[in-house]
Amino acid sequence: MVNITSAEFVTSGTRPEHYPPGDLLEIAFVGRSNVGKSSLINVLVNRKSLVRTSSTPGRTQLINFFRVNGSLMLVDLPGYGFARVPPEVKRQWGPMVETYLAGRSCLACVVLIVDVRRTPAEEDRLMLQWLRAYDIPVLVVITKCDKVSKNERAKQASLISRTLGLAPDEMAFFSALSREGRDAIWARIEAIMAEGHSPSVDGAPE
């Protein structure tokens, strides 16, 4: 998927009836607000603004679907851990995201994104724990690697690995500025997809 021929927004929603049919495999992206999720998706698909970036944490409160090369769906899930949003919005986030993750049969992998400069938060640990409980393949992408030195990156990678209980092959490094890690992340995603199954339309017999 390194060669991107098309990338387009499909739809947004908060409930299953808003989702696309589910006839394409889906890769979902999740993480705390402002970890660089939108920038990661834009670089992966070679687009500057397919996914809008925002300096306001918690701005994205919908599940957004993007079709790539007509053969794969990238799913942008709302960021968590945001402080400056109404309590009711925070209460809605959990059920909305859990409904998608637990019930989407075409979901092939979740990319959990963490900032290299931060210690993983409790929400990150709980999200990873939840995904593992549902046996959903996970790739942890460590973003903003251009913001720290190589020595600091190594220290933080070790800290993130210990905090989340990750093996080296469960992590990938990324920089939106230099595009470091783009090809490696696609390779990991494609390897995970190859181990999975062909999607069936949600609600239809297997």
Curated annotation (Swiss-Prot):
Cellular component terms per the entry's GO annotation: cytosol
SUPFAM superfamilies cross-referenced by the UniProt entry: P-loop containing nucleoside triphosphate hydrolases (SSF52540)
Molecular-function GO terms, alphabetical: GTP binding; metal ion binding
Alphabetically ordered keywords of this record: Cell cycle, Cell division, GTP-binding, Magnesium, Metal-binding, Nucleotide-binding, Septation
GO biological process: division septum assembly
Function: Necessary for normal cell division and for the maintenance of normal septation.
Protein name: Probable GTP-binding protein EngB
Taxonomy of the source species: Bacteria, Pseudomonadati, Thermodesulfobacteriota, Desulfuromonadia, Geobacterales
Gene of this entry: engB
